[in-house]
Amino acid sequence: MQVSIETTSGLERRLTVGIPAEIIDQEVEKRLKQAAKTVRINGFRKGKVPFKVVKQRFGEGVRQEVLGDTIQRSFYDAVRQESVRPAGQPSIEPKQMDEGKDVEYIATFEVYPEVELKELDNIEITRYDAEITDADIDKMVETLQKGQSSWEPVKRKSKKGDKVTIDFLGKIDGEAFDGGEAKGHQLELGSGSMIPGFEKGITGMKAGETQPINVTFPDDYHVEDLRSKDAEFEITVHEVLGEKLPKLDEEFYAKFGVTEGGEEKFREEVKSNMEREKQRAIKAKVKEQVMNALLESNSVDLPAALVQSEIGAMRQQMVQQYGQSAQNLDLQALLPDDMFKAQAERRTALALIVSEVVKKYEVKADKDIVRSLIEEAASTYEDPQEVINYYYSNEQLLANVEAAALEEKVVELLLEKATVTDATVSYDEVIKPQEPQAEEA
């Protein structure tokens, strides 16, 4: 086998491979002879079909099979010979495939980049913490109440937090416009789901009232023709629903698994759950800072094939949320690559950099961390042990957890080298979701 390789640009490589004709011919003949033992052709007994007839009938098809198998096998032999790591599948361009002649093809592909890690001692991390106060617990209890609340019609004026059922008709310069009318529309006041001023104009109205409100469409409104336009909406309120919170009693506590101990025990459980949530948030934010520091200090070329693969994985993950309804959708149009590209590039860059950290510092996945992560995931299920057993019996799931454990060990390693500053903030600030990062490497 003859092999030559050249760099075309950046991470792209062009591999030219030549395979002697006799290798192909010998394999074709071998497969045809094997087929002749079992093939059935009218006029011949099984196993007695002349080789010439078998070759005439099946030769071309078998040759194409052999070519495909040989090209695939020879490609991976060639990249091992040249000590390159393909990132993604190659594009194969046949150059010479005629029978009786040496086979030649060109494989174009990207390789994994060389990652030169910068020193990791200058990383600065802020580790936030918070004391969970009675006020924090009160707020969480109210949130739990709201999750169990009911809605009842009220006769008073509407206020923020109420739900109203309305008809509206909008006009600009006295003329109605597309999308400016609705009947029986339900709206939660204060939700911010309508243009600025709309909900505020309705606040204070009672069921049965009709009145006009004046608003201005935002400069960046999604309908271009309506941007910056002044409009008048005639609003009719049909119903105002006020939220009714459930009482804090034994029945309410039981819904959260507290069947004895009353309010004191319930608040203890709430605080315990808040503490767990806080620790998860602290851990996640420290990890996010470490990963950001890795990205900022290490630049890496990204193979387009890896980024595209990550885009596909992210799209598939989102598709699963649609369930059966996704089958008839044009997902490429609904979920275009650009929607995922920045985040996919970030994930790909981090994967390459973290992999290099693992290699350089010989980081190993800790079995205790793997067990801890599995137990944490299983703790929310009715039968945690059944879930734990399932994880350990599923190679793919276990591999995913081991990868996460490896990442945790990398974070631990970098924290040992980093300058860590502790800071106390409010509970809400600690658990506040992080802004998604999408820096390009």
From Swiss-Prot:
It is found in: Cytoplasm. The keyword Cell division applies. It catalyses: [protein]-peptidylproline (omega=180) = [protein]-peptidylproline (omega=0). Its EC number is 5.2.1.8. One of its GO terms (molecular function) is peptidyl-prolyl cis-trans isomerase activity. One of its GO terms (cellular component) is cytoplasm. Residues 161-246 form the PPIase FKBP-type domain. Keywords: Cell cycle, Cell division, Chaperone, Cytoplasm, Isomerase, Rotamase. One of its GO terms (biological process) is protein transport. Belongs to the FKBP-type PPIase family. Tig subfamily. Involved in protein export. Acts as a chaperone by maintaining the newly synthesized protein in an open conformation. Functions as a peptidyl-prolyl cis-trans isomerase. Consists of 3 domains; the N-terminus binds the ribosome, the middle domain has PPIase activity, while the C-terminus has intrinsic chaperone activity on its own. HAMAP family: Trigger_factor_Tig. This is Trigger factor. It comes from Teredinibacter turnerae (strain ATCC 39867 / T7901). The gene is tig.
